């Protein structure tokens, strides 16, 4: 069976079953959050841009935020046969893309996105089994639902599976 590649945009999410592949490009300060049920081989990817929906007045796109995007992704995965007790997660992104002498919350959005993501996953009881976060470089990721591998591609920092 040929693998179908689903592209996930910014503030977007997609779900696939094996042998589907989920990919997102341009993870700078954004975080790509993969959730996976290794028994049902159901995978989901959400590309979040901001940590919390309650801190922004225009929060109509719930997939933009870690706190709401992860929960929506789980709902969609359950419709495809995933079991919430078996979910594991992998993370990539959360970079500090712009250097600044001012250590402000606005400039540390990547770090804040990673922290919020980890808080939400902990609250939901979903373990993080691998991550490639931080740094000052962008990432493109591909998740293979057939075997649970996450390919992380960077410019100048190599390519690796986590």
UniProtKB/Swiss-Prot annotation:
Presence of the UniProt keyword Lipoprotein in the record: no
An annotated Gene Ontology molecular function: protein-glutamine glutaminase activity
Domain of life the protein comes from: Bacteria
Enzyme Commission number(s): 3.5.1.44
InterPro entries on file: CheD-like_sf, Chemorcpt_Glu_NH3ase_CheD, Cytotoxic_necrot_fac-like_cat
Catalysed reaction equations from the record: L-glutaminyl-[protein] + H2O = L-glutamyl-[protein] + NH4(+)
Function summary: Probably deamidates glutamine residues to glutamate on methyl-accepting chemotaxis receptors (MCPs), playing an important role in chemotaxis.
Name of the protein in its database record: Probable chemoreceptor glutamine deamidase CheD
Gene: cheD
